[in-house]
């Protein structure tokens, strides 16, 4: 995985902030390397094979096009007549067909020829567009991880799970670790890039309008049932950390303090995880 051209290609794709010339913000490539480091440690803590988690984390953004979700929507519109486009499904396509490393029988590409466990761990949405689960309002989620004509390889690497009676649309533990490592990494590092790039200062969160905007976005994307009091309490806990940096001045001291903050937050989120058996 580490030597694949698909992974190197992520170096030309932005994460959130546009790269500058004198201080480099994260690209999809550097983000994936950081996700792999977080995922490997979390996976080891939870009893996963760290190499499998590492592979999944390095792979998690391979299929995502330039220009982020806007690029994904544009490609989905263009490909609507042939089943659409989805970055996660494209990741599986790259790993099993498009990345030219192993040619199987009848001159058919086997992609990187990864193990079942590795492919299963990369599968964030283990369903096709047709079989996508429904939300509470009855509408289907637009996310899917399998193109219809990639179903044979999906059924191959999920064969053992199916035989064991595992729910067909449940992600394996390694895939859940990959997903969490991604969330932990971007939730901290994207803010770091925004601060280092001069786009925002953490002290702005003291202002009611900015604080409310963060709460509204959190409810829209992640926690629709959360109250303003709960969100305010969570943010206040972060603001009381001894490494919290209200204002980045650009001095060596503030740079070091902010790096300490990001390390502390990554560790805080990673070590708070635990297994829930259902």
Where are these regions (language model features)?
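Glycine/alanine-rich phosphate-binding loops at beta-alpha junctions
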Residues: 1-30
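Sequence-structural signature of the catalytic-core scaffold of metal-dependent phosphohydrolases
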Residues: 2-8, 12, 37, 45, ...
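Catalytic phosphate-handling regions of large nucleic-acid enzymes and associated NTPases
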Residues: 20-31, 62-67, 78
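Alpha-helical phosphate/pyrophosphate-handling elements in metalloenzyme active cores
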Residues: 21-52, 165
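Short alpha-helical catalytic segment bearing the HExxH-like zincin motif
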Residues: 53-58, 179
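Secondary-shell segments that build the walls of catalytic and ion/ligand-binding clefts
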Residues: 252, 256, 260, 273
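Conserved small/polar residues in nucleotide/adenosyl-binding loops
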Residues: 276-278
């Amino acid at each position: 995985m580490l030597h694949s051209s698909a992974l190197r290609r992520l170096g030309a794709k932005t994460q959130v902030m546009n790269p500058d010339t004198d201080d480099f913000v994260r690209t999809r490539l550097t983000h994936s390397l950081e996700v792999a480091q977080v995922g490997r440690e979390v996976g080891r803590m939870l009893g996963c094979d760290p190499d499998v988690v590492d592979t999944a984390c390095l792979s998690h953004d391979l299929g995502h096009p330039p220009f982020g979700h806007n690029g994904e929507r544009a490609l989905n519109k263009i490909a609507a007549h042939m089943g659409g486009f989805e970055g996660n499904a494209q990741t599986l396509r790259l790993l099993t067909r498009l990345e030219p490393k192993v040619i199987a029988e009848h001159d058919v590409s086997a992609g990187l020829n990864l193990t079942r466990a590795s492919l299963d761990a990369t599968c964030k949405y283990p369903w096709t567009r047709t079989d996508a689960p429904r939300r509470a309002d009855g509408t289907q989620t637009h996310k899917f991880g399998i193109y219809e004509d990639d179903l044979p390889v999906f059924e191959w690497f999920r064969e053992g799970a199916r035989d064991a009676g595992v729910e067909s649309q449940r992600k394996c533990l390694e895939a859940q670790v990959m997903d969490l490592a991604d969330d932990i990494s971007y939730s901290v590092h994207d803010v770091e890039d925004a601060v280092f790039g001069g786009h925002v200062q953490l002290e702005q969160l003291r202002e009611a309008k900015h604080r409310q905007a963060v709460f509204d976005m959190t409810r829209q994307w992640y926690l629709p049932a959360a109250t303003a009091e709960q969100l305010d309490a969570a943010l206040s806990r972060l603001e009381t950390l001894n490494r919290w940096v209200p204002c980045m001045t650009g001095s060596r001291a503030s740079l070091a303090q902010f790096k300490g903050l990001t390390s502390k937050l990554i560790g805080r989120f990673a070590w708070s995880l635990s297994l829930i058996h259902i």
